[in-house]
Design a protein with these regions (language model features):
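Nucleotidyltransferase catalytic core that binds NTPs
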Residues: 1-197
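Short beta-strand segments at enzyme active-site cores
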Residues: 96-100, 137-138, 230-233, 269-278
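Hydrophobic anchor at the beta1->P-loop junction of P-loop NTPases
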Residues: 202
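P-loop (Walker A) phosphate-binding loop of NTP-binding proteins
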Residues: 205
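Small-molecule kinase domains that catalyze NTP-dependent phosphoryl transfer to phosphate-bearing small molecules
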Residues: 311-359, 363-369
Length: 369
């Protein structure tokens, strides 16, 4: 990592440099002296983003006494917890850090997902408190380290004086030998109730929240053991299977048709395909539905009002559209045809992304569960 001033010098002599993500969404303005966020940074949905668990190292007060950290790749076993108790008593530890390593990518099918791992270590913390009443037990969501940093380095940054690395693979007899909370998460991940393939097509204005809800739905489904969950983001798919298409009516319909066809193939292979394009025209949405004939298919309209979408606009697209510098922009210079055949309508300005995702999941369970 380099200081912002060094990065600024490397990039050039401009007074301000705009930092964008991989989708070209502006994140921050960088000068030689400061970094200014363009808009409040978006966060994910789920326990991995809980402020109580995802804490900065500066928020964990160091104690002037031995501190043990457990690096948890998987839900902790009874043997691991007993070892922590024994070692804490041996060295008179005053704090135990339960560090759940959280990756940006989902765990493989059949394995405990980030939310499940965090539920397991939170429950383990309560169990340890009963055995070590004078020891402070702190569960943490620790992002997987980048570069040369190791998980042990991160644990020591949180104040650990001794680091224990948990198992990276389950024993053959799992979940035998695990506490109830860990057993529940292992069995949840191995659940095969979601046996059918399905397609969920979100539609809505830019900035309506459909991509955030789609991502939350994918996380919820994986957390319940669903196999082959695939999130097909509208912007990302436009850069791949729809590269070269414009934004006129015919091109937009072709884009949605291709997206629907790709989603249907994934569903026929047993996966749950979640797509989140704008899909402004009834014709394009009908083509996507037609591609999924014979499959469970949900059309979810995210009906967030236009004025709210404009307020949320991180890319500044609505401003450019109203200024006339972007043509054929849905909601401004190109129409959005409100679907009359949506299976579910959600105003994302009235509910949280998590609540919206739960609503979609419950309907999908009735349709394809």
């Amino acid at each position: 990592a380099q200081p912002s001033s060094a990065l600024h010098r490397y990039l050039g002599n401009e007074t301000t440099v705009l930092l964008c993500d991989e989708e070209n969404t502006p994140l921050s303005e960088l000068s030689a002296s400061e970094v200014t966020h363009v808009r409040p940074l978006a966060t994910g949905v789920g326990l991995a983003w809980s402020q109580e668990l995802r804490r900065h190292v500066s928020s964990v007060t160091e104690v002037d006494a031995p501190t043990i950290a457990l690096i948890a790749y998987l839900p902790p076993s009874i043997a691991e917890l007993n070892s922590l108790i024994t070692r804490a008593n041996e060295i008179d530890a005053k704090r135990i850090l339960l560090c759940a390593l959280i990756s940006r990518t989902p765990a493989p099918d059949g394995e405990v997902q980030p939310s499940g791992l965090l539920r397991a270590i939170t429950s383990a913390a309560k169990e340890l408190e009963g055995s070590l009443p004078t020891c402070q037990i702190t569960p943490l969501a620790v992002p997987w380290p980048k570069g040369d940093l190791s998980p042990e380095d991160l644990a020591r940054a949180y104040g650990a004086t001794e680091v224990v690395t948990g198992a990276e693979r389950y024993p053959a007899n799992a979940p035998t030998g695990y506490p109830v909370s860990s057993t529940e998460e292992i069995e949840r991940a191995r659940n095969t109730a979601w046996g059918k393939g399905a397609v969920v097509l979100f539609t809505g204005l830019s900035g309506s929240g459909k991509s955030t809800i789609a991502a939350a739905l994918a996380e919820l489904l994986r957390d319940e053991g669903a196999r082959g969950v695939a999130l097909l983001d509208g912007d990302a798919m436009r850069r791949s299977i729809s590269a070269g298409l414009g934004f006129d009516r015919a091109s937009r319909n072709t884009n949605v048709q291709r997206l629907g066809a790709a989603a249907a193939e994934l569903a026929r292979a047993g996966g749950i395909a979640i797509a989140a394009p704008i899909a402004p025209f009834a014709e394009g949405r009908a083509l996507a539905r037609k591609a999924s004939v014979g499959l469970p298919f949900l059309l979810v309209h995210i009906s967030t009002p236009l004025e709210v979408c404009e307020q949320r606009d991180r890319k500044g697209l609505y401003v450019k559209a109203r200024a006339g510098t972007i043509s054929d922009f849905t909601g401004i210079s190109s129409p959005y045809e409100v679907p009359d055949d949506a299976d579910l309508v959600i105003d994302a300005s009235a509910v949280s992304a998590y609540e919206a995702a739960v609503s979609v999941k419950e309907l999908l369970k009735k349709t394809a569960g």
